[in-house]
Amino acid sequence: MIREFSAGGVLVRRFRGRPFMAAVRVKDGTVLALPKGHIDPGESAAETAAREVREEAGVVGELVEKLGDVRYWYQRDGERVLKVVSFFLFSYRSGSVRDHDHEVDSAEWVLLEEAPRLLAYRGEREMAETALSRFGAAR
């Protein structure tokens, strides 16, 4: 069995008093997802999450707290891989979703209360639900 570790972020910003979340579109724009990626050597999971949010979504956040881990299995070259993705909650500090990098098709703001319905992956929908329940208390 192979294990892989990644990290990602739910970055929240208020517009007109309502919380919005930075999300990215991948796979020719057909999949709405959270920014995430592999943990680089010497990087903590929280540092990776902040970097991935900055690179993929074009925005910079302040770490609020860890939201949780998403675990799932997949096959690679005939071997089972256990993937663990640690997600962190961030509050918006600066930047624009127009400044996303080439790894994603686009980045956008999504109303946080709609994110659990719109995100493509179950684990990420759960992280958005957790962020929705915690964001009011956190900021």
Protein language model features and the residues they cover:
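N-terminal strand-loop-strand
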Residues: 1-34
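Short, charged/polar surface micro-motifs in flexible loops or helix N-caps
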Residues: 16-18, 28-31, 40-41, 69-71, ...
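The catalytic Nudix box helix
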Residues: 34-67
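NUDIX/MutT-family hydrolases
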Residues: 91-131
